[in-house]
């Protein structure tokens, strides 16, 4: 099957340059999250937990709901991009809205999770491990929130102007950003929660 090089998001030189710029940006993001992961993994073994063990605090059902919401949103985002490339604006809008709703579910549960930890006396200041934990998850959560706002602004623009060769590349870049955040979450789920549920200190 031949690859269609004339999809709506690939029809302008500016759009292609924006994609290249985004990949450079993602490289910096990998460096950021890589540093945060390295810090947390180091502090998992020998860091100060202040007596608040992850084996007692982490709740698998909550984490699974968050994981399902974010990973399924990656699937719905992919469907939205498929319809964007078919130039079916209404279907694209529908699936992007579903994606953003799932993103909001994720953010809502993360806020609930942080509030729950706070009620148990856990915050970034009590120990080195928890400081790295909140910085990593907070940074990821802020990125997800930024992605939601970014996508909403773009969808409003598309609703007003219609889907065209100028805003389609921007939507494609948003989708890449969203998939990147999902990949980061898979690492968080594995390295932070799965290990944390069986090991503290």
Curated annotation (Swiss-Prot):
Family annotation (CDD domains): Ubiquinol_oxidase_III (cd02863)
Gene3D superfamilies (UniProt xref): Cytochrome c oxidase, subunit III, four-helix bundle (1.20.120.80)
Keyword terms: Cell membrane, Membrane, Oxidoreductase, Transmembrane, Transmembrane helix
Catalytic activity as recorded in UniProt: 2 a quinol + O2 = 2 a quinone + 2 H2O
Pfam families from the UniProt entry: COX3
E.C. no: 1.10.3.-
Location(s) in or outside the cell: Cell membrane
Superkingdom field: Bacteria
Membrane topology, as annotated: Multi-pass membrane protein
GO molecular function list: cytochrome-c oxidase activity
GO biological process: aerobic electron transport chain; aerobic respiration; ATP synthesis coupled electron transport
Major subcellular site: membrane
Transmembrane segments: 20-40, 62-82, 91-111, 133-153, 172-192
UniProt family annotation: Belongs to the cytochrome c oxidase subunit 3 family.
Identification of the protein by name: Probable quinol oxidase subunit 3
Species, as recorded: Staphylococcus aureus (strain NCTC 8325 / PS 47)
